[in-house]
């Protein structure tokens, strides 16, 4: 006997979370609960505003159609919006016990705010020191100076930088000028510095700063391949699609000799814990990019270890549909 419940959540965000010039006041999404006999599977469907192609309303419509068919005994379709494909495939994998329980809860901390506070926090970090800095929100020169200060002050630190295609080539070069050439090898990668792939490639070749593909991964003409100056592929399952698609991308990335990084699209704690399990399974040697829970004020259904944020139980969520 198959049973389905589809819930909706809306979690208030901390002040100051901005996605491509849009302030994100709440994170809204859907939670899927599948039950077959005594087995349960959970999944999260949460298109990211400004980044996902599908809206939450479109995702809900596609999910309802698929869940009604599943409850009647059919399999999920392969051709679905990415957030729906990811959430449904996670729920199915949990139900079938194909998503390993072991999780990688290490985080590359997201560095915002005062460099002095960042320095203290990073200095106290145990183990491999890998942190992430968003660049491109302020002046490129300022970004370069902050990155240089952090790398100079902490000789065992590696930084992942993310520019979200926000720089012209001239601005990207302005950033690079303020990072000492001797420190650039400790930039693990800079995600999509320029507005076009070709400009980003040129930037990497001319500055010696490695880049990673992120937005490009979701474009129809993208192919994973080894090329000079490219060190990593960032995989955001909510934006990429099903578990099978994520597995395929990780495999292609490793075969090309590149690093695959499983990364968050600001999912709730339920989605984040599943991403931690996915990272432990598919990319065990790489710290995932999952330090987004503290942007929210509440956890949903599944706790993230060591988080003190309050938890919303399933019973506290709105039910969209039940079979």
UniProtKB/Swiss-Prot annotation:
EC code: 4.2.1.113
Pfam families xref list: MenC_N, MR_MLE_C
Top-level EC class: lyase
Cofactor: a divalent metal cation
GO molecular function, one term: magnesium ion binding
Highest taxon of the lineage: Bacteria
Binding residues for Mg(2+): 162, 191, 214
Reaction catalysed by this enzyme: (1R,6R)-6-hydroxy-2-succinyl-cyclohexa-2,4-diene-1-carboxylate = 2-succinylbenzoate + H2O
Keywords tagged on the record: Lyase, Magnesium, Menaquinone biosynthesis, Metal-binding
Keyword Mitochondrion set for record: no
Active site (record annotation): 134 (proton donor), 236 (proton acceptor)
Pathway where this protein functions: Quinol/quinone metabolism; 1,4-dihydroxy-2-naphthoate biosynthesis; 1,4-dihydroxy-2-naphthoate from chorismate: step 4/7; Quinol/quinone metabolism; menaquinone biosynthesis
GO biological process: menaquinone biosynthetic process
Keyword Magnesium in record: yes
Entry-linked Gene3D superfamilies: Enolase-like C-terminal domain, Enolase-like, N-terminal domain
Annotated PANTHER family: O-SUCCINYLBENZOATE SYNTHASE (PTHR48073:SF2), O-SUCCINYLBENZOATE SYNTHASE-RELATED (PTHR48073)
Role according to the record: Converts 2-succinyl-6-hydroxy-2,4-cyclohexadiene-1-carboxylate (SHCHC) to 2-succinylbenzoate (OSB).
UniProt record similarity statement: Belongs to the mandelate racemase/muconate lactonizing enzyme family. MenC type 1 subfamily.
Protein name in the entry: o-succinylbenzoate synthase
């Amino acid at each position: 006997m198959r049973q389905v419940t589809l819930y909706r959540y809306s979690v208030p965000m901390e002040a100051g979370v901005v996605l491509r010039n849009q302030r994100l006041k709440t994170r809204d999404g859907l939670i899927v609960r599948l039950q077959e006999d005594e087995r349960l599977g959970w999944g999260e469907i949460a298109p990211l505003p400004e980044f996902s192609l599908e809206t939450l309303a479109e995702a809900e419509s596609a999910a309802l159609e698929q869940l009604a068919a599943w409850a009647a005994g059919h399999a999920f379709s392969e051709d679905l919006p990415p957030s729906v494909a990811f959430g449904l495939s996670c729920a199915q994998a949990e139900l079938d016990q194909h998503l390993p329980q072991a999780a990688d809860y290490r985080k590359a901390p997201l560095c915002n705010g005062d460099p002095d506070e960042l320095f203290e926090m990073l200095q106290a970090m145990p183990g491999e020191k890998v942190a992430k800095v968003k660049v491109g929100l302020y002046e490129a020169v300022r970004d370069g100076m902050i990155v240089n200060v952090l790398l100079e002050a902490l000789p065992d630190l590696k930084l992942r930088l993310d520019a979200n295609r926000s720089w012209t080539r001239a601005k990207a070069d302005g950033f690079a000028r303020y990072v000492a050439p001797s420190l650039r090898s400790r930039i693990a990668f800079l995600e999509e510095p320029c507005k076009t792939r070709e400009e980003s490639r040129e930037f990497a070749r001319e500055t010696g700063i490695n880049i990673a593909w992120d937005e490009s991964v979701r474009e129809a003409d993208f192919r994973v391949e080894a090329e000079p100056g490219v060190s990593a592929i960032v995989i955001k399952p909510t934006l990429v699609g099903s578990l099978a698609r994520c597995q395929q991308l990780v495999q292609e990335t490793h075969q090309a000799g590149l690093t695959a990084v499983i990364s968050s699209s600001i999912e709730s704690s339920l989605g984040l814990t599943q991403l931690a399990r996915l990272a432990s399974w598919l990319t065990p040697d790489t710290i995932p990019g999952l330090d987004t829970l503290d942007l929210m004020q509440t956890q949903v259904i599944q706790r993230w270890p060591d988080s003190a944020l309050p938890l919303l139980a399933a019973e506290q969520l709105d039910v969209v549909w039940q079979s």
